[in-house]
Amino acid sequence: MSCYDLCRPCGPTPLANSCNEPCVRQCQDSRVIIEPSPVVVTLPGPILSSFPQNTAVGSTTSAAVGSILSEEGVPINSGGFNLSGLGGHYYSRRCLPC
């Protein structure tokens, strides 16, 4: 059971966005000539795959505060949901008092 299961909700509503798309690419086949008799064998090309991920995590409060600060001309991080300075305890693993 995680620490967050033990705490009653007391902070802003969580906001998360995640993207996970698999990428598969097959390369060209290879041809090999085996001696002494001239035989051509076709070997299938390798299949390469990866799973790039893009995730943004924050809260509705941090998004609202960022919007207010940007309207007032205060420079904010263009990365979006940055919680530094707006309650870094969201990264903590232990329960903080509400």
Curated annotation (Swiss-Prot):
Residues carrying N-acetylserine: 2
Key word Metal-binding present: no
Tree of life domain: Eukaryota
Keywords in alphabetical order: Acetylation, Keratin
Keyword Metal-binding attached: no
GO cellular component, one term: intermediate filament
GO molecular function terms attached to this record: structural constituent of cytoskeleton
Pfam family, one: Keratin
Subunit description: The avian keratins (F-ker, S-ker, C-ker and B-ker) are a complex mixture of very similar polypeptides.
Protein family membership: Belongs to the avian keratin family.
Name the UniProt record assigns to this protein: Feather beta keratin
Organism of provenance: Cathartes aura (Turkey vulture)
